[in-house]
Amino acid sequence: FADKPWAKRVPSIEQWRTLFRTHNGIEPPPPLICDFVYCHEEADVAADRGSRYIASYLESVLEHYEVMGDHFRDTAGYEAYANAAETLQRIGAGGFLRGFLDATAHGTPEQVLGAYRTRWELVGGFEAAPSFRFGGIPYDEAEASLRLFAAEVLPELRRWEVEGAA
């Protein structure tokens, strides 16, 4: 998931690649990166709506899973969640939202492609798994975002595939 700076994701992706090679004896496929995408022709609209809907989604996750609570601390097998909770308590929901927004691909088609290009430069080739309906986005807005992505972003991503990128 696109949920924190991509430079911080690189070690876990490299660990996955190493483990894949070790256990399968072949090169790993490109990682599948899930993302919340909001694409709009106008940068200010994309920034406003993208951040609003992503914030709505994150608020629901924080509330539903009680991610910022202390209940993971003494639960065996949930140490990673406990560590995440400590970080979230330190940076707060606002800090988490800023990091999440910075990691996601939302904006104009050019901005979305720029976000994907930055990822490619850090992690290498990947498969994109965008989600267009989240955080209460009305269906018509989600469809418009998806169609714009399909018309202007996807053809470029397909060229990257031919070139060995995404």
Predicted regions and their residues:
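Glycine- and other small-residue-rich loops at beta-strand/loop junctions that grip anionic moieties
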Residues: F1-A2, D35
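C-terminal helical cap(s) of enzyme catalytic domains, especially alpha/beta-barrels
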Residues: P11-W16, P138-R158
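Short, charged/polar low-complexity linear motifs in solvent-exposed/disordered segments
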Residues: Y65-V67, S131-F132, R147
